[in-house]
């Protein structure tokens, strides 16, 4: 174990929280396939940010409760950022009193760049911003083709959007708007390319995103 790993383990063990028992979820870690439960547990047990430890702990607690009762406890609502009529999937917990750290767990859908081409710097920026304001759970990419940033409070939804918008990313894919825009890498990879795919992508995104922007 590296020095950094030891520091993270020591730090996370000092976080004052009672880990929820999750015998049913534990079963999902068995078998040959990667488990999303293992990923959430890793954030709960190993992340250096106490807010994320607690948030993912209560997320696991609520999910175990759902498995026990065979009922979902997420309800919708209205959450948005200034000037937008979509891009956010609101999630409020009906059992927030029992699991207060995850009682608000909204998802932000963010438009991917043309060709799904990311620099390592942009990925680090997104990850750092999400660790600052969200749960640390990210999906590349959701069913709509967007980046899914899963698990934010209502207040931090605005803060996270403001930060990523400053370095060029925009919302999309949820609500009364076009789900996403996709394009191939184009001339950067294909000998048969005969248009500027990235420019076409950009023009279409700008056109349809206007439908989502609100004064």
Regions found by a protein language model. Give the residues of each.
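Small-residue-enriched alpha-helical segments and adjacent helix-cap loops
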Residues: 2, 6, 26, 41, ...
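Charge-rich, low-complexity segments
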Residues: 1-94
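N-terminal glycine-rich anion-binding loops that anchor highly charged ligand groups
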Residues: 89-105, 133-136
